[in-house]
Every structure is written in C-alpha cells, then in structure tokens.
Amino acid sequence: MATETFARLRFARISPQKCRLVADQIRGMPVERALQELTFSPKKGAAIVKKVLESAIANAEHNEGADVDELKVSQIYIDQGPTLKRIHARAKGRANRILKRTSHITVAVGEKVKG
C-alpha cells in the first residue's frame, strides 16, 4: 500500500481547539499505540477521534488490503466547522450569545517506512 487511507467525520459537536489537543498527541504514532493512548485518555475528543481512527484502519484493511501492524497515523487534522449560535437570557432583558462550535476531523493512515 503506497497511498494513505482516509476517514473523515464532519460536523462533530466539539470545539476544534479541544479536539486538536488529542490529535497532537497521536500524530505520527503507530496505530496500535495511538488506539491505546485514546482509550485511556479522559478527554471527550479522545473517544471521537478514536472512532475516526478505527474507521481509517478498517478502510485501509478493506480497501487497500493493508497489514494493521504496519500502519501509522500519517496525518490527522481538525478543521473548524460551522458554528451554531444560541442565546442565553440575562438580567434586565438582555441576552448573551453562546457559540456551539463544530469540527471536521480527518485521519489518514499509511504504512511505516522501512529502513
């Protein structure tokens, strides 16, 4: 398998800033190690990124016939999705805006370079 295999999750209800904390931890890791890191991380983003990583691994196995032991997280990036704008009622007839941010998560797995 010379190419990378991708998996994407769009419109995930987590802010990109919080999700990037998790993504930065597993970038470049072998997939087995990355899955362990995500399994034991207490962050909400870890569970979401783990599902996308598992999907990328399954895509590599099914579509490319890749060996799981040879895969690593070659790329992972979190882009900002659309923001849901909500209001929060305050005193004296005022209102504050609440921004509910979304993320587009992209994970690419590729084979480790031998040598």
Swiss-Prot record:
Which InterPro entries did the record assign?
Ribosomal_uL22, Ribosomal_uL22_bac/chlpt-type, Ribosomal_uL22_bac/org-type, Ribosomal_uL22_CS, Ribosomal_uL22_sf
Name its species: Thioalkalivibrio sulfidiphilus (strain HL-EbGR7)
Instruction: Output the superkingdom of the source species.
Output: Bacteria
Q: Which NCBIfam families match?
A: rplV_bact (TIGR01044)
Q: What is this protein called?
A: Large ribosomal subunit protein uL22
Read off the Gene3D superfamilies from this record: Ribosomal protein L22/L17
| Organism classification | Bacteria, Pseudomonadati, Pseudomonadota, Gammaproteobacteria, Chromatiales
Keywords, A to Z, come to: Ribonucleoprotein, Ribosomal protein, RNA-binding, rRNA-binding
Give any Gene Ontology cellular component.
cytosolic large ribosomal subunit
Free-text function comment from the UniProt entry: This protein binds specifically to 23S rRNA; its binding is stimulated by other ribosomal proteins, e.g. L4, L17, and L20. It is important during the early stages of 50S assembly. It makes multiple contacts with different domains of the 23S rRNA in the assembled 50S subunit and ribosome.
> Which GO MF terms does the UniProt record name?
rRNA binding; structural constituent of ribosome
Q: Quaternary arrangement and interactors, per the entry?
A: Part of the 50S ribosomal subunit.
Gene Ontology BP term (one): translation
> What family does this belong to?
Belongs to the universal ribosomal protein uL22 family.
